[in-house]
Regions:
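RNA pseudouridine synthases
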Residues: 1-295
């Protein structure tokens, strides 16, 4: 694979880890072994990349992941022969990946729900959409391929209902608003998302529920489902999600991770056509933090 450096000034190993899927250590390994070329030449890790440099690197073979059903507690809000709705706890990864082969939502689903759709492959059975590891709340699960196709199409057509509660930094100037700003991979750090003209359209609606001076409780409704959408949009308007260590400030509310909860989920049942809507209460630590902010 190759990338073209748009902004110079970084060490070669740092540029590779920021702009590609390689970790810093793997980038260094490839540089030392001569697998990384800059404009066709081998360079050392300390080389400072320049604007216009073409860097060629090696994409490692994907790991063969082994995973099993695990008896992990899981709150199943609803279940029938086609779909299920689960309340994912904060801190749980949705599906297995390198470094996360156990303890994921998929491991739990395989234990609690025997029939899952296979459209997303063996690593993501039943998974129609995702929420971040540190976001709690509702997810729809497909139990067969027909249901999966229907639910995925509804998400694509922006017909499903997804509302979140978040504690954010600061006091928003308006009680309601719409954030319409395209989101794509950050050009400065490829592991992050950012508002960028090259991104895909992204729309988030917000409603301030309660104000606490330095923080606000906000309900957000997604019209699109970009990676990290709420976190990126709220940071973009200067009110990042509290506890967000990636897009927020270092000084923030402690003890929970990010205060973001997928509270309401609505969709059309793929078989019956019935409109279903579910709500999951915010976690106890979220409630305790709100009580503390009110004092």
């Amino acid at each position: 694979m190759e990338i073209k450096i748009e902004t110079g000034g970084l060490r070669l190993d740092k540029a590779l880890s920021d702009l590609t899927e390689l970790s810093r250590s793997l980038a260094n390994e490839q540089i030392k072994s001569g697998q990384v070329l800059v404009n066709g030449q081998v360079k050392k890790a300390k080389y400072t990349v320049q604007e216009g440099d073409v860097v060629t690197y090696h994409v490692p073979e994907p790991e063969v992941l082994e995973y099993v059903a695990e008896e992990i507690p899981l709150e199943i809000i609803y279940q029938d022969e086609d779909v299920a709705v689960v309340n994912k706890p904060q801190g749980m990864v949705v599906h297995p990946s390198a470094g996360h082969t156990s303890g994921t939502l998929v491991n739990a689903l395989m234990y609690h729900i025997k029939d899952l759709s296979g459209i997303n492959g063996v690593l993501r059975p039943g998974i129609v959409h995702r929420i971040d590891k540190d976001t709690s709340g509702l997810l729809m699960i497909a139990k067969n391929d027909e249901a999966h196709l229907a639910l995925a199409q509804e998400l694509k057509d922006k017909k499903s209902l997804r509302k979140y509660w978040a504690i954010v930094h600061g006091n928003l100037p308006n009680d309601r608003g719409v954030i319409e700003a395209p989101i794509g991979r950050s050009e400065k750090d490829r592991k992050k998302q950012a508002v960028t003209a090259k991104g895909k359209p992204a729309v988030s609606r917000f409603h301030v529920i309660e104000r606490f001076g330095d923080y606000s409780l906000v309900e957000l409704q997604l019209e699109t489902g970009r990676t990290h959408q709420i976190r990126v949009h709220m940071a973009y308007i200067g009110h990042p999600v509290a506890g967000d260590e990636v897009y927020g400030p270092r000084k923030t509310l402690k003890g929970h991770g990010q205060f973001l909860h997928a509270k309401t989920l609505g969709f059309t049942h793929p078989r019956t056509g019935e409109t279903l809507e579910f709500t999951a209460d915010i976690p106890d630590i979220f409630k305790e933090t709100l009580e503390r902010l009110r004092k």
